[in-house]
Amino acid sequence: SIDFGGESGSVDQAALFSDAQVVARHTGERFDFESRATVGYTWDMSGGDDNPDNETRIYDLYMDLNDQSLGVSTRLGRQTLRNQGVLGRFDGGIVSWQVAPSYRLNVLAGLPVYNPNETVETSRTFYGFSVDALNLLDLIDVNVFMNIQEVDDVNDREAAGAEIRYFGGNRALIASVDYDFGYSELNSVAALGDRTFANSLTVKGRFDWRNAPYLTPENALTG
């Protein structure tokens, strides 16, 4: 029960929650293929409404094709990404081209998805690109990105940034920065590192500063 200023009430719920994941993979001489579906369903069993609150959730639903001969890979569908300037789940695609053993170009575009029970929402769009420099000096991976997001044809986010990963045997460091050049504001700076000493003692450190939520007109309108 819930008490509001001396008045109490109760909320009852009877529902069945279920989630499932299906993955299909194929590895060939030239092409590698993967498809993944992660979905959920809520069955409202309260029986007190002619229109029950049944809910379908689609967390991931995508296909991934990699051409080893050309060094090109493509992923299409609903997917989740938290780098390259992408802030989470979206409906869209990523195309990556391994232009050299240590360098990869990525182009991506899509429709941001804020809740897995959403259908395709066309009022929000984003597009961007990034460059990966891999295994530099056998120690460092670097990703540099630019990402533009629009809501109802209004610029919502104009971001550029980078992520650096360093692995040096007994030490590691991951650092990232996200800067919105539309607002001339820093959105986030984060770093995570650890060091293991000869006596097996491990020291870890973390720094995380960010705007919460990120500066966007849509976030401002929703409070």
Locate each region found by the language model.
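Gram-negative and organellar
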Residues: S1-G223
